[in-house]
Amino acid sequence: MVAKGKKASADAVYAKKTTRSANPFDNSTAQSSKRGNPFDVHVNKEKFKILGRICKHDRGMPGVSRAKALQKRAQTLGQQFAVKHKTNRFKDNRIGKHLSGDQLTESVMNARYLAEKMSQVRSNQKAEKFNLNDDELLTHRGQTLEEIEQYRDERSDDEELDDEALDADFTAAAHFGGEGDSAQDRQAAIDEMIVEQKRRKNEIAKEKDEVYDLTEKLDANYKLLLPLVAKVTKDEQDAKPPPDAYDKLLKEMIFEPRGSVADKLINPDELAKQEAARLEKLENERLRRMRADGEEDEEASVAKPKHRSADDLDDGYFLAGEDDEGDDTLAYDLDGNLGTHLNGKKEAVLKGDENEDDDDKEGEEEEEEDSDEESDSEVDNLSDLKESESESEPEEAPKASKKKAKKSADTIPASLDTSIPFTIKMPKTYEDFTELLSKHATAQKAIIIERIIKCNHPKLEGVNRENVVKLYSFLLQYLKDLFEDASEQDIREHFQLLSKLMPYLYELTQLNPERMSNTLLEVIKEKYEEFRKNHKMYPSLDTLVYFKLVANLYSTSDFRHPVVTPCFIFIQHVLSRSRVRTRQEISMGLFLVTVVLEFVSQSKRLVPAVFNFLQGIVHMSIPKRDVEQLEITPPFERDGPLSKLLALPANTESTKLEPQQLQPTDLVTQTITPDFKVRALDTSLLLIKEALQLVEEHVGACYLAQPFLALLSRLPLESYPEHVHQHHKDATELAEKLAAQKMKPLAPAEKKPKALRLLEPRFEAVYDDKRRPKMSKAKEERAKLLHKIKREKKGAIREIRRDTSFVQMLRLKQTLQSDKERHEKVKRIYQEASVQQGELNELSRAKKKKKF
């Protein structure tokens, strides 16, 4: 129910809908300013309707656009045209107008004054060009020069004032008796005057001495004061800020020496061709010298003149060298004796034989000295692997004489052939390769390998590229044969050969990395299969040499490597499974530990087998009773004779041994000696220190260092020399330092806020009916840019034309306005003149009336 006197909501809505106003203009809406006049709209019709084309100029309002353009030009060009040639605005163009009062230095004031005078001269150049009456007052800091100048006559301190000696008081007292009651004697007055004069002279001399001393002191410190006096000026009173990094770098670049012009870099292909051509040329010369072909012809051609005329004076007769045998021309010799050439030749031959005998004796002595020096330097000179040997041979070969070659052939054994060819063909079989190397010494084997590589370089034309792969396989097999059955006498020589061949193995690896790596990897796989058959025995020595090759030829810091990673696993299996019972096995284990530490020197990885092996070596160096056991991990034994294999007996005196490293003979010797025990423990201590330094930054370094402390504390150092004590102290201190470190508590890793997913916009080419030629991307961009420039240029020309018409219209309006004002002035002048003429006529008529 609805309350009485109230209408329902439906009735109210119905009444509102049906209510209409009586005024017909109440429902009409006022025309807004945005709607515009429909007659101002201009429609641009298209001939064809094309799908996909968006036309931006289908309709427009030219009247509104024209009005806006005129309004914009009136606000810009109109205002500029209105104030043209008008100077009703003050502009401060003075120098240093932004500086405050403290910053206005004397140089700024002088520059401002000079600029003002120059502007005045330019503005009134014709009027004041020869004006000498310049009535301007010169000022300085607000004061005129007349106020500043006071015409003082200040005398210097050095000038003596003689007139002060006879002042008025002295004259009155000396000549007139003075004004005092007691009269002085004349002699007393003169004495007093002399004393006073001496006192003043002494004071002046003292002052001069002080000034002289100060001057000498300043002269002595002149060099210290010179930078301050020379650099500090009135403009630089304020302290300059220190030069920043950019200024320092700029000065370094200014005074940096310029690079000198270098030769053009040679292409590797051209370099290989040049090297092959050089070796071929040297080989041809060597063969020619060996056969002695063409030497007599060359000497005869040099000595014998090609042509002798009838007027020849024989000036070069005795300078031509050897002459023809049948030449018996009568001539004077150098001593002025008359004779034939045959007599002089016989004497020269006799003298030459004596000289040759002396030279042979001297040559024999020199060769004996050279052979001694070469034998001494073969062991020491191991670093120069490539350049010294390859370059010295070609230089020495041309200088060798026949007799010296014969003498050297007698002194050197017949099994070693010193004549190395410069061009060597690739051996077809491994037997030929070993036969080629067996004829030469260790130092010459590296030269042979170098020349084989250069003569069979893959970049040369007509060379089989498989030759370098075959040479690499031959070298690996040759190293295997050398080290597999090495003895104590030749093991050192084999390692020297390995160090000399290492650069050439690296060069071969770089020529074809994939093939060479696969070849070496197959050899290592074969060695690993042999090791798995009897994993309790250490592999042969050639396997260890292959590991050393891998360390020198490849990057061992990679996380995964096709050659290094298998070697890594192989070494860990050897160290953790093979038994340690002899001197050879201990030396091999320490050699493998050194190689592994070289592997992880950059990556600092953790290798548990290395730490276990080093703990085992220290464990075997501790003397133990039969019932005593120490915890150790296999392959080392807790008790028994092998658990104290490296322990020194109590009665052994080895404290005087000098520090030595492990020798190459240790790798092929089985018996254990006291000096080897000392060297093994000393090497182990050094390796423990190096291994702990590598894992120093690891989280669990404390757990790796704790087992070493218990073993190092049990070592009896009384029987060991001093250097072992020092190495034991260093290793113990480092282990205690790492064992004292505390591990950080585990904490969840900090998660970075997840970035919002960014979607790349997908651009779609808009189709239009315009056919364009196919162009590259760069040409297409250039064409678009040229088209845009053309459109902008047309628009700029159109705007300039409209601006010109607008300015012409303003000038026309200004001209019309001035003409209108002039016409009004002329009209007003005529009007005033006509009024004046009327009054004048009226006066003249009045005068005529008075006359009559």
Curated annotation (Swiss-Prot):
Q: List the disulfide bonds.
A: none
User: Coiled coil located at which positions?
Assistant: 190-221, 774-851
For bias type Acidic residues, the affected ranges are 354-381
Specify whether rRNA processing is a keyword of the entry. yes
Q: Where in the cell is it found?
A: Nucleus, Nucleolus
Q: Which UniProt keywords apply?
A: Coiled coil, Nucleus, Ribosome biogenesis, rRNA processing
Claim: Coiled coil is one of the keywords in the record: yes
Task: Pull one GO CC term from this UniProt entry.
Answer: nucleolus
Segments carrying the region annotation (Disordered) are 1-40, 288-324, 338-410
Where does the record place Polar residues bias? 20-35
**GO biological process, alphabetically ordered:** maturation of SSU-rRNA; ribosomal small subunit biogenesis; rRNA processing
Q: Recorded GO terms, molecular function?
A: snoRNA binding
Q: Where is the composition biased (Basic and acidic residues)?
A: 344-353
Main location (coarse class): nucleus
Function statement: Involved in nucleolar processing of pre-18S ribosomal RNA. Has a role in the nuclear export of 40S pre-ribosomal subunit to the cytoplasm.
| Quaternary structure annotation from Swiss-Prot or TrEMBL | Component of the ribosomal small subunit (SSU) processome.
As for family, the record states: Belongs to the NOP14 family.
Q: What is this protein called?
A: Nucleolar protein 14 homolog
